[in-house]
Regions:
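Glycan-recognition and catalytic cores of secretory/periplasmic carbohydrate-active enzymes
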Residues: 1-387
C-alpha cells in the first residue's frame, strides 16, 4: 500500500477510535433518555439546543459505521443504536406517519414541521438500525413513513414536496437523501418497495435535476420542476455533485446497473468549476462556472473524498492516478477541519479569508466525516499511487 495512503488511513482511524468515539460516547448521548445531543461547544461542553431527528438518524449511522470499522466496541454500539432508534420512533413520530423536525431542549422550543429532509434522514436512520438488529417494528415504522410521503407529499410533476417557511417547495437535496435511505434499506432488506423508491428518485434525478444543457445539478425548482434561475443562471453545489455521483455509482454497483456517464459528468463538473486554487471544494457555484459562495464547509471535502475513491475504482487504469490524487487532496483538506484544541471535535466552515468560523460542533457532521474515512480506507488502496 502507498505510504501516503497507509498514513492517512492509520491517522483517520486512530482519530475515530481514540478521540471521537470516546468523547461522543461520554458527552454525545443524553444520560436520561439515550438520545443523541445536538451539539457540543469547541471546548466539548454539551449545549442546550433543540434536538433534531436528523441528528438521531445520522448518529445511528455513525456509531454503526464505527463498529463496522473496528473503531467502537460491538456490544456498546448495538446498545447505543437500539436505544437511539427507540428514542427516534417514540419522541419524533407524528400521527400521520411523518417525523417531527426537532424536539425542545430545556430552554428552547422544538419544531414539529415534517420537512422532507427530516423524513429522508429518519428513513435512513431506521435502515441503519434495522441493519444492526432486524426487528420487524423498525421496518413497519419505515414503511409507514413511505406511505405518508406517497399519500400526503406527492408533487404533481413527480417527487415529493419540501416545507420551507410554511410553504411547499421543490428541492433536489431531500430527494438525494431519500435515494440514500432507499439504498441503505436495499442493503439490509430485499423488499421490492425499497427498489421501487430508489428507482423513482434516480429517474427524477436523471430527468429533472440534471440540466441537459450544462450538465450541472440544480438545487431549487419551480412547481413544474424547472430550475429557479437568476439572470439565466442557477446555483449548483459541488458537494452535492460529488454526493450524487457517489450514490448513483454505489446503487449501480449493488444492482448490477450500468450508470457511469452521469456520475462522471457530475464529478468532472465539480472538479473543474467547484474547487478553489487551494484545493478546497466551494460551497456554491453558478451554472456558468462562476463561484457564488467561496467559503468551504467541511462536508463537500468529505463527499469529494468518497466520490473520487469510488469512481476511481471503476476508472480505466490510466485514469486511476487522477482520482487517487483528488481523493488524497480531499482527505487532506478534510483533515484540517479536524484539528481542534479539544480532541474529537471538528470545524464546520472555512471562510474565504482562510479562517474557520467559530461555531458549535454539530453532532450531525460525523455522518459525513466517517463515511468519507470509511470509503477512503476501503477503496483508495486499490488505486495506483498518486505521486
Amino acid at each position: 500500500m502507498d505510504s501516503i495512503v497507509t498514513r492517512n488511513v492509520a491517522r483517520s482511524k486512530d482519530w475515530l477510535s481514540n478521540q471521537v468515539f470516546p468523547l461522543w460516547f461520554e458527552k454525545g448521548i443524553h444520560a436520561g433518555d439515550g438520545g443523541f445531543v445536538e451539539a457540543l461547544s469547541l471546548r466539548g461542553e454539551i449545549l442546550d439546543l433543540p434536538r433534531r431527528a436528523m441528528v438521531q438518524a445520522r448518529q445511528i449511522y455513525a456509531f454503526r459505521t464505527g463498529m463496522d470499522m473496528g473503531c467502537f466496541p460491538e456490544a456498546r454500539t448495538r446498545a447505543v443504536v437500539a436505544r437511539a432508534a427507540a428514542f427516534l420512533i417514540e419522541r419524533y413520530s407524528a400521527p400521520s406517519g411523518a417525523f417531527f423536525h426537532s424536539i425542545p431542549s430545556a430552554s428552547k422550543p422544538g419544531n414539529e414541521q415534517p420537512d422532507l429532509y427530516t423524513q429522508a434522514f429518519a428513513l435512513f436512520g431506521l435502515a441503519n438500525a434495522y441493519a444492526a438488529a432486524p426487528e420487524a417494528s423498525i421496518k413497519r415504522r419505515a414503511l409507514a413513513l413511505v406511505d405518508y410521503l406517497r399519500r400526503e407529499r406527492r408533487a404533481p410533476g413527480g417527487g415529493y414536496t419540501e416545507l420551507e417557511d410554511g410553504r411547499f417547495v421543490l428541492r433536489s437535496n431531500p430527494h438525494m437523501h431519500l435515494f440514500e435511505a432507499a439504498i441503505a434499506w436495499l442493503r439490509a432488506d430485499e423488499d421490492p418497495r425499497w427498489k421501487e423508491l430508489a428507482a423513482e428518485i434516480l429517474d427524477l434525478c436523471l430527468t429533472k435535476f440534471v440540466d441537459p444543457e450544462t450538465g450541472a445539478l440544480c438545487e431549487r425548482f419551480a412547481g413544474d420542476w424547472t430550475p429557479e434561475r437568476t439572470d439565466g443562471r442557477f446555483v449548483f453545489e459541488p458537494g452535492h455533485h460529488y454526493e450524487w455521483s457517489w450514490l448513483i455509482t454505489l446503487h449501480a454497483e449493488s444492482r448490477g446497473l450500468d450508470a457511469t456517464q452521469v456520475p462522471l459528468r457530475l464529478y468532472r463538473i465539480a472538479e473543474a468549476r467547484g474547487v478553489s486554487p487551494g484545493g478546497d471544494a466551494y460551497d456554491e457555484v453558478w451554472s456558468d462556472g462562476v463561484p457564488k459562495k467561496k467559503s468551504s464547509r467541511f462536508w463537500p471535502q468529505g463527499e469529494r473524498t468518497k466520490s473520487a475513491a469510488r469512481l476511481g475504482a471503476h476508472a480505466p487504469d490510466g485514469e486511476k492516478p487522477g482520482f487517487a490524487r483528488s481523493a488524497d487532496m480531499a482527505l487532506e483538506s478534510l483533515s484540517r477541519y479536524l484539528q481542534t484544541p479539544e480532541p474529537g471535535l471538528w470545524r464546520d466552515t472555512l471562510l474565504e479569508n482562510g479562517q474557520f468560523r467559530e461555531e458549535p460542533v454539530k453532532a450531525s457532521s460525523l455522518y459525513h466525516i466517517i463515511n468519507a474515512i470509511e470509503e477512503y480506507a476501503a477503496l483508495r488502496p486499490g488505486l495506483t499511487s498518486s505521486r
